[in-house]
Amino acid sequence: MMRRLSVLMVMLVLGACSSMPHPAGKPLPSMTFSHLKALGLSVATKDISVQPTDNQARFSQNLDEMMEIYLTQKLNPRGEQGKVVAALDESSIVLVNENSPNAAADFFGLGGADIYKVMIKLRLEHYNDAGDLVYGTVVNAHREIKISEHASIAEREHTQFEGLEQLFLMLDQRVNKILLQDMKIGVGGVEVF
């Protein structure tokens, strides 16, 4: 009888520890960036380069791949001369553990949080046909994603996904402004939103 009870207890404990990989058994959606407007540009070519991200810090999404997809879909050359360069020069995801602000919970090692500090440094440049730099700038985007240390794997992945989505929305607004207002290389009447 004791053995059966032990086996039952182990099964209950292991069942409670396992977490579904994704909410409601469904995989996280892919970040396709289809909700962001692509920009037609009055240049003949685009040059996209992405440096590997430093320290992915147990992050559910690959920042390098997402950045390459974003830039490839965002920049659409439609002109006959010149080139636009979009280079992810630096990016990182750093995990910082934060203790609980409650002294009692902190004493027992409870109530803390994991903070993912995501940083992107994107270089945008416009060159004329002669290869001269017409305009160049660097866009920095930062986001802190805070997750309770007690969150399930599914909740962590979902929160990370939402945090990156917000980071890319902020980055997209800056990229639109630079390409359309500062570089003035947009075509097709695309609006900055």
Question: What are these model-predicted stretches?
Answer:
Residues 13-16:
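C-terminal motif of bacterial Sec signal peptides marking the signal peptidase cleavage site
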Residues 18-21:
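Bacterial signal peptide processing site
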